[in-house]
Design a protein with these regions (language model features):
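Non-globular, low-confidence helical/coil segments that flank catalytic cores
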Residues: 1-190
Length: 190
């Protein structure tokens, strides 16, 4: 899920090559901020991609324009989701839950992704903020093995409620060395 910043392309390709990946079946983009789609156009040009999946809202962004152009050049379908989309595999599935409305805010327009692999479930929240998290609470599973925290680990009441409701065993956040995760979020995860 997601394609990081433009300058992360080489690292992404190196990771894919180490795993022997030669094709990307589904390129899932939680939303269209540059730190989530910066390398997406380059990935579409570098690898055969079966489908690009993202939320259905427009963003005036050079990166989204480049992605649309690359998808068109490579004849790669770009599905803009307005309802849940599930893909089943031999050992599991993933479900993409788009926002019910356009919140007018990239982060609140994030797709929420639930991945189930065998008996283990993961929740990837994009950069969802209060409105989007409140919307998702009713759809959440009873528990997740791992939650990828939204928006650099920013804490808010709906996120704390989601953690209490789903009791994840692990949580992951992408933060820079200058950022700290709030104490109340750490306490909720303990």
């Amino acid at each position: 899920t997601d394609a990081a910043d433009e300058d992360d392309f080489d690292s992404i390709c190196a990771a894919l090559e180490r795993r022997g990946v030669q094709r990307i079946d589904y390129l899932v983009l939680s939303h269209y901020d540059k730190d989530h789609i910066g390398s997406a156009a380059a990935l579409v040009r570098a690898y055969p991609v079966g489908q690009i999946l993202g939320p259905d809202y427009e963003e005036d962004s050079m990166y989204l324009t480049l992605l649309k152009r690359a998808a068109e050049e490579r004849n790669t379908p770009f599905l803009r989701l307005t309802e849940n989309y599930t893909v089943k595999t031999e050992n599991g599935s993933f479900t993409l839950d788009p926002p019910d409305i356009d919140y007018g805010d990239d982060n609140n327009n994030s797709l929420v992704t639930t991945v189930t692999w065998r008996e283990t479930s993961f929740l990837l929240l994009g950069d969802a903020k209060k409105n989007r998290l409140n919307e998702f609470l009713d759809a959440a599973l009873d528990s997740y093995e791992l939650i990828k925290l939204p928006h650099h680990g920013d804490s808010n009441k709906p996120l704390l409620k989601l953690i209490a409701q789903t009791t994840p065993r692990y949580a992951a956040a992408t933060v820079s060395p200058a950022e700290e995760i709030e104490d109340k979020l750490i306490a909720a995860l303990a």
